[in-house]
Amino acid sequence: MGVRAQPLLARSLITTTQPWILSARSKPSSLLSQPWNKTVHNQAHVAEQPTDPANMEKLVGRHHPLPIRSEFVGSTPIDTATLEKIEVGAGLHRIPVSISDWTAYGIVRFLRFFADLFFRKQYVHRAVVLETVAAVPGMVAGMLRHLTSLRLMRHDGGWISHLLSEAENERLHLLTWMKVCQPSLFERMLVALVQTLFFNVYFLAYMLFPKTAHRMVGYLEEEAIISYTHFLAEIDAGNIPNGPAPKLAIDYWNLKEDATVRDVVLAVRADEANHRDMNHHFADRIVIHQEDLRHMVTADSLKPIVKLSKVDIKSD
């Protein structure tokens, strides 16, 4: 994906009637990585001395995951006050306007019912299963669009990098929560089963109905934001211990050394807001037949299909 495609996408989202969608400070990691990624330089150096282990270590060392939001990239660690100021649009809901939208929303609400029934207020364990599922769509969609680009021998329109960044980000969420809790054997088996089923179902769904697939992920992320908001409420109420944040989370989100689990929840929720907005926008692009992200879309072209509401997300 070309570097130029992403600023255009960010600007196109800002020009829509959705001011909460992808603010100028929440660009994908594929864009953020450009100024800091020295891979090209290192590759040239390795090519000159391919057998030097030191050169290979320098090259490999550059490939650390980067966060998807610009708030988490910088030289100054982020404190709790800064995390709380990140606008996530908690409670904002995309109103379904088509059969495809209603189908996606119905599936998500169906899954939410069983998640609530099984996990109740065990939010850390819920997060482990949630992030296992959430890491699948970006990888599946990115893989299918990658293969399509190769087969048709044409540019992908800028989707692949965004989708793979999403998958990587969700994977880091999972690894973080695995550090916080120790899932039981049953939960690990459940994760393996759910991931296997969801991968195959989503793979088929994306091949046949990509618009519905992206809309479904958008609604999944809406539910994720609600869950993480309830998670915060339980921590504030003293029902969930607010222990120290894992070192993995501190490094990934550039948090302060004394960061807590609550800070991690705030950071993860901000990421989920980004994924919500991106996937709803991807679905919109398919609806209006303007899938090339290198080309801007106007607010007028999206106005007929963008309907928003605010839902009550008070903890149960």
UniProtKB/Swiss-Prot annotation:
Enzyme Commission code(s) on record: 1.10.3.11
GO CC entries: mitochondrial inner membrane; mitochondrion
Keyword Cell cycle: no
Cofactor binding, note field: Binds 2 iron ions per subunit.
Family annotation (InterPro entries): AOX (IPR002680), AOX_sf (IPR038659)
Cofactor: Fe cation
Keyword S-adenosyl-L-methionine: no
Reactions accelerated catalytically: 2 a ubiquinol + O2 = 2 a ubiquinone + 2 H2O
UniProt binding sites for Fe cation 1: 131, 170, 173, 272
GO biological process: alternative respiration
Topology of the protein relative to the lipid bilayer: Multi-pass membrane protein
Range annotated as the organelle transit peptide: 1-26
Function: Alternative oxidase which function may be to reoxidize reducing equivalents produced by glycolysis such as ubiquinol.
Family statement drawn from the similarity comment of this UniProt entry: Belongs to the alternative oxidase family.
PANTHER family: ALTERNATIVE OXIDASE
Protein name per Swiss-Prot or TrEMBL: Ubiquinol oxidase, mitochondrial
Lineage: Eukaryota, Fungi, Fungi incertae sedis, Chytridiomycota, Chytridiomycota incertae sedis
Gene: AOX
